[in-house]
Amino acid sequence: MGLETEKADVQLFLDDESYSRHSGVDYADPEKFADAGLDRDPHRLNSHLKVGFEDVIAEPVSTHSFDKVWICSHALFEISKYVIYKFLTVFLAIPLAFVAGILFATLSCLHIWIIMPFVKTCLMLLPSVQTIWKSVTDVVIAPLCTSAGRSFSSVSLQLSHD
């Protein structure tokens, strides 16, 4: 049994096992992590990170290194990636989480207690400012524009060809 789709007299049959349900980006399978505990990236914020050996280092068909070199470099890549990541997270995760918490707490506080009250105050004052601006426009700017229009309406240009 396969997947059948029809479009413009074309049929496509695929096996369910070989059919990839995602397009291009290799998303982590949530069921795969159900046994290991919580999914640490439930919103798939870092699904674009491809740090596998084959995604970083690739040899074209015309230039291959020795098999032992390829195997050793693959092993060293994976081990160093694992060890360095663990080392960096031990020393950087807690301080960076602390700094990010302070930053987001500060931004949230500023947004809640300063920015939104300021925006609401401006929105409350805008109808009054609009009324005052309309009055200033009607009293000062409209007569100036009317008199300038009348003055320039009496100007006539004549072009002569000499």
From Swiss-Prot:
Disulfide bonds: none annotated. Monomer or homodimer. Interacts with CAV1; the interaction forms a stable heterooligomeric complex that is required for targeting to lipid rafts and for caveolae formation. Tyrosine phosphorylated forms do not form heterooligomers with the Tyr-19-phosphorylated form existing as a monomer or dimer, and the Tyr-27-form as a monomer only. Interacts (tyrosine phosphorylated form) with the SH2 domain-containing proteins, RASA1, NCK1 and SRC. Interacts (tyrosine phosphorylated form) with INSR, the interaction (Tyr-27-phosphorylated form) is increased on insulin stimulation. The gene is CAV2. The modification Phosphotyrosine is found at Y19, Y27. It comes from the Eukaryota. Belongs to the caveolin family. This is Caveolin-2. The modification Phosphoserine is found at S20, S23. Phosphorylated on serine and tyrosine residues. CAV1 promotes phosphorylation on Ser-23 which then targets the complex to the plasma membrane, lipid rafts and caveolae. Phosphorylation on both Tyr-19 and Tyr-27 is required for insulin-induced 'Ser-727' phosphorylation of STAT3 and its activation. Phosphorylation on Tyr-19 is required for insulin-induced phosphorylation of MAPK1 and DNA binding of STAT3. Tyrosine phosphorylation is induced by both EGF and insulin. May act as a scaffolding protein within caveolar membranes. Interacts directly with G-protein alpha subunits and can functionally regulate their activity. Acts as an accessory protein in conjunction with CAV1 in targeting to lipid rafts and driving caveolae formation. Positive regulator of cellular mitogenesis of the MAPK signaling pathway. Required for the insulin-stimulated nuclear translocation and activation of MAPK1 and STAT3, and the subsequent regulation of cell cycle progression. Its main location: nucleus.
